[in-house]
């Protein structure tokens, strides 16, 4: 299974290498039977479908119901800006073949999308943005943050700083403050889509508020 699906071909040749990296790791896209989306922004869902063809033909796509309704079941499109309409079209294009095949499975706020995987509603970046929790038998956990953080410096010290892609800046600031405090107190691993390599680590308190401590890795 996968958590998020990358950009596909939407953002140029420097991105969209998920399938290639899967193959380099010894896996094929048709072996993936589930993809859980943290949210439906194009850099997280664009890799689901390329040129109308599903890239994970044997996978169910799991997404928060609140997120699905915002992007797919949304009404009042005439009043939206051209940029928002473009984002909505990308969302529809990414999910269309899976919707047609009845392979999109929606989960409620804070519900488990799959066995051993939980979710935490972290709204603001998008209405249904959810962090995904990998539960282990020994009580440890790894929380896939999604877009709680957009870098390893400013927002750790200033959680109220938001980016243009955040749907609700006030909500995302509160979400980020909560997520950082919980990660520091819980001492669990977090994985951030926009954190620098290796992208996995811990949150620690420091003199300026928080800092990211990357997880040690072996080449």
Model-inferred region functions:
Residues 16, 21-27, 31-43, 58, ...:
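Metallo-beta-lactamase
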Residues 1, 106-137:
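Core dinuclear metal-dependent hydrolase active-site scaffold
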Residues 133-219:
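Cap/insert and terminal regions of metallo-dependent hydrolase folds
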């Amino acid at each position: 299974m996968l958590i998020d699906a990358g950009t596909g071909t939407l953002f140029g040749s420097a991105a969209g290498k998920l399938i290639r990296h899967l193959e380099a790791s010894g896996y094929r896209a048709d072996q993936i039977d589930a993809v859980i989306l943290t949210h439906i922004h194009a850099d997280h869902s664009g890799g689901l479908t390329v040129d109308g063809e599903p890239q994970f033909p044997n996978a169910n796509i799991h997404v928060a119901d609140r997120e699905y309704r915002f992007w797919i079941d949304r009404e009042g499109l005439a009043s939206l800006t051209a940029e928002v309409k473009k984002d909505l079209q990308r969302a529809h294009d990414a999910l269309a073949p899976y919707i047609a095949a009845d392979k999109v499975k929606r989960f409620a706020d804070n519900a488990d999308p799959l066995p051993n995987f939980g979710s935490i509603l972290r709204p603001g970046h998008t209405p249904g943005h959810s962090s995904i929790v990998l539960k282990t038998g020994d009580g440890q956990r790894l929380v896939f943050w999604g877009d709680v953080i957009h870098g390893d410096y400013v927002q750790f010290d200033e959680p109220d700083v938001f980016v243009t892609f955040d749907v609700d800046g006030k909500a995302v600031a509160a979400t980020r403050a909560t997520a950082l405090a919980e990660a520091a107190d819980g001492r669990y691993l977090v994985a951030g889509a926009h954190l620098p390599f290796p992208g996995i680590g811990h949150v620690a308190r420091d003199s300026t508020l928080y800092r990211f401590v990357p997880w040690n890795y072996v080449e």
